[in-house]
């Protein structure tokens, strides 16, 4: 009765606190969620730690102030743990033979996968870090079949995990327990392409590289380019709001996705597949599904604005002595290259050494070894003018001491070898051993400070490296070690999240939260904001069957 009253009152922060402190078996999850709560309000000057270890609060919101004492007691009690414990939601049903028979009726035998070998692959994430125990993978061929699957699963309270190319890095695309896998790989048709507007409409299972190949024949390019383009699906890209190499030029998917079709938990099909660049009729609901990681609905079709393929593409590989030079170079590139600047990527010397040591056929394009390397890509319509512009920029940067060495690719093969270095870092990390990956968004001037701080903190325990999309403030922080161990993880987390929050950053720039960072959301979002997100989740997925244990703190849904 008390819980119903709290839900009706809309005082979700109070409800959230109640959930947090009632889930004692998940004490590490509780600690993380409460830790984020504490850090958020300490940073806003509303919460003060006293010399005796207690806290004084100046929170006046009635939903928070009544429960802050209990919250803080839990925080002090549990401390900060490196591991997250998740319990299977007991309200979810378990799969039985009748369920399997139903799915075979609507999908056909071959599209209901029970084979252990195929399930082993589908249950395991790309980094082999997260592994579920699903006994069933479904392969729908169209939106109607997705609708039938979800309507049935919702009625039976069978949890579902949407899956595409399974290239995610935060455990978002694999089961946590025995969730039914719904893989959209067979939904891979290109439905239409308008060469006047450049609008492409396709199904969610289309592989990004295949879309790029198709568009190339039409004289267009995708606004999105990723290292995983050979495997990732456009539906997964949209569901995680993937960023990639071209964001500095073409912006995020919130800007380039014009419309989408999605199926909600109860099987309802939401047709928002517009192709218009302007539509001011009410709430633009597609944005709820972009970046929601399949927790609000399964994206089945996408309408995306593509760009004309320009004739002039140039790529420079540059060496810089320090991070300050990299920052200044970015400012100069924006001023001097302007509209033709299409990528500005960076990697440190540790990343370069890793690639050289673990990938065959890769070499450093510049003669001198430096602390940092930059890839600058320009895209325009005048080959001669664009190249002269890039050469003049590099010469000027060399004279200013911002660049110590550099080379411009002379042909497509050399350009590919440059990109191989940047895109091969993740592959090299896998070959090197255990890796702890963090995808952070920070003010550009702060990006490398966390790398240096973490090196000092970890010492010889691990190899810390930083690379990423400097043009949009996205750092890929990677810690490479011989093996995974709790001591190392305890030194990394929650330190990385606390550092990022302190410097007004985001703990997820483009990879999403998944299961890895669901409990860490408070480091980047206020409790009020998370409460509203949870309300939206409950509205669209009342039984919580869609990608459970992901995106939002597990404790909010434990009841």
Curated annotation (Swiss-Prot):
Q: List GO terms (cellular component aspect).
A: mitochondrion; plasma membrane
pH-related activity info reads:
Optimum pH is 8.5-9.5.
Q: Which domain of life is it from?
A: Eukaryota
| Details of cofactor binding | Binds 1 FAD per monomer.
Q: Where is the FAD-binding PCMH-type domain?
A: 130-309
What upregulates or represses it?
Answer: By dark-induced senescence.
Q: Which cofactor does it need?
A: FAD
Q: Name one GO biological process term.
A: photorespiration
Q: Which UniProt keywords apply?
A: FAD, Flavoprotein, Mitochondrion, Oxidoreductase, Transit peptide
Q: Where in the cell is it found?
A: Mitochondrion
Keyword Transit peptide listed: yes
Loss of function: phenotype: No visible phenotype when grown under standard conditions.
Q: Which reaction equations make up its catalytic activity?
A: (R)-2-hydroxyglutarate + A = 2-oxoglutarate + AH2
The EC number of this protein is 1.1.99.39
Q: Where is the transit peptide?
A: 1-78
Q: Name one GO molecular function term.
A: 2-hydroxyglutarate dehydrogenase activity
- Which InterPro entries does this one have? FAD-bd_oxidored_4_C, FAD-bd_PCMH, FAD-bd_PCMH-like_sf, FAD-bd_PCMH_sub1, FAD-bd_PCMH_sub2, FAD-linked_Oxase-like_C, FAD-oxidored/transferase_4, Oxid_FAD_bind_N
- What Pfam families does the entry give? FAD-oxidase_C (PF02913), FAD_binding_4 (PF01565)
Does Secreted appear among the keywords?
no
Annotated function: Catalyzes the oxidation of (R)-2-hydroxyglutarate to 2-oxoglutarate. May be involved in the catabolism of propionyl-CoA derived from beta-oxidation. Involved in degradation of lysine for the supply of carbon and electrons to the ETF/ETFQO complex during dark-induced sugar starvation.
Homology family: Belongs to the FAD-binding oxidoreductase/transferase type 4 family.
Assembly state and interactors? Homodimer.
The protein in question is named D-2-hydroxyglutarate dehydrogenase, mitochondrial
- In its UniProt entry, the species of origin is given as Arabidopsis thaliana (Mouse-ear cress)
Query: Which gene holds the coding sequence for this protein?
Result: D2HGDH
């Amino acid at each position: 009765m008390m819980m119903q009253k709290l839900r009706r009152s809309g005082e979700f922060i109070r409800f959230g606190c109640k959930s947090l402190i009632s889930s004692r078996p998940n004490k590490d999850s509780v600690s993380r969620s409460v830790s984020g709560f504490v850090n958020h309000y300490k940073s806003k000057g509303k919460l003060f730690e006293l010399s005796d270890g207690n806290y004084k609060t100046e929170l006046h919101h009635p939903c928070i102030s009544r429960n802050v004492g209990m919250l803080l007691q839990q925080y002090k009690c549990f401390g900060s743990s490196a591991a997250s414990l998740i319990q299977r939601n007991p309200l979810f049903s378990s799969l039985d033979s009748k369920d399997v028979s139903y799915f075979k009726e609507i999908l056909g035998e071959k599209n209901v996968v029970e084979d252990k070998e195929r399930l082993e692959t589908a249950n395991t994430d790309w980094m082999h870090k997260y592994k579920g125990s699903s006994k069933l993978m479904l392969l729908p061929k169209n939106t109607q079949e997705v609708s039938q699957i979800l309507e049935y699963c919702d009625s039976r309270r069978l949890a579902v995990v949407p899956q595409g190319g399974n290239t995610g890095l935060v455990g978002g695309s694999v089961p946590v327990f025995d969730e039914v896998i719904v893989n959209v790989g067979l939904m891979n048709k290109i439905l239409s392409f308008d060469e006047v507007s450049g609008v492409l409409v396709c199904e969610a299972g289309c592989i990004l590289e295949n879309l790029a190949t198709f568009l190339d024949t039409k004289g267009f390019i995708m606004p999105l380019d990723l290292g995983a383009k050979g495997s990732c699906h456009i539906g997964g890209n949209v569901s995680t709001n993937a960023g990639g190499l071209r964001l500095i030029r073409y912006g995020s998917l919130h800007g380039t996705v014009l419309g989408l079709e999605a199926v909600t938990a109860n099987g309802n099909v939401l047709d928002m597949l517009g192709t218009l660049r302007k539509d001011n009729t009410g709430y633009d609901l597609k944005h709820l599904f972009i970046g929601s990681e399949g927790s609000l609905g399964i994206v089945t079709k996408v309408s995306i604005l593509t760009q004309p393929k320009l004739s002039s593409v140039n790529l420079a590989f540059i060496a810089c002595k320090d991070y300050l030079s990299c920052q200044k170079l970015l400012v100069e590139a924006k001023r001097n290259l302007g509209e033709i600047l299409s990528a500005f990527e960076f990697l440190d010397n540790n990343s370069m050494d890793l690639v050289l040591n673990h990938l065959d056929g890769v070499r450093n394009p510049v003669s001198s070894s430096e602390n940092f390397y930059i890839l600058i890509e320009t895209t325009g319509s005048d080959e001669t003018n664009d190249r002269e512009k890039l050469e003049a920029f590099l010469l000027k940067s060399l004279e200013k001491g911002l660049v110590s060495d550099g080379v411009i690719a002379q042909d497509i093969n050399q350009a590919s070898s440059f990109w191989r270095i940047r895109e091969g870092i993740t592959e090299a990390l896998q070959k090197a051993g255990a890796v702890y990956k963090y995808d952070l968004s920070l003010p550009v001037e702060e990006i490398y400070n966390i790398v240096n701080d973490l090196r000092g903190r970890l010492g010889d325990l691990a190899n810390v490296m930083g690379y990423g999309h400097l043009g949009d403030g996205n750092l890929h922080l990677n810690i490479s070690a011989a093996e995974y161990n709790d001591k190392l993880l305890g030194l990394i987390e929650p330190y990385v999240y606390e550092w990022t929050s302190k410097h007004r950053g985001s703990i997820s720039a483009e990879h999403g939260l998944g299961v890895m960072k669901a409990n860490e959301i408070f480091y980047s979002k206020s409790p009020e904001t998370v409460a509203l997100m949870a309300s939206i989740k409950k509205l669209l997925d009342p039984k919580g069957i869609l990608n459970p244990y992901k995106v939002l703190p597990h404790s909010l849904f434990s009841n």
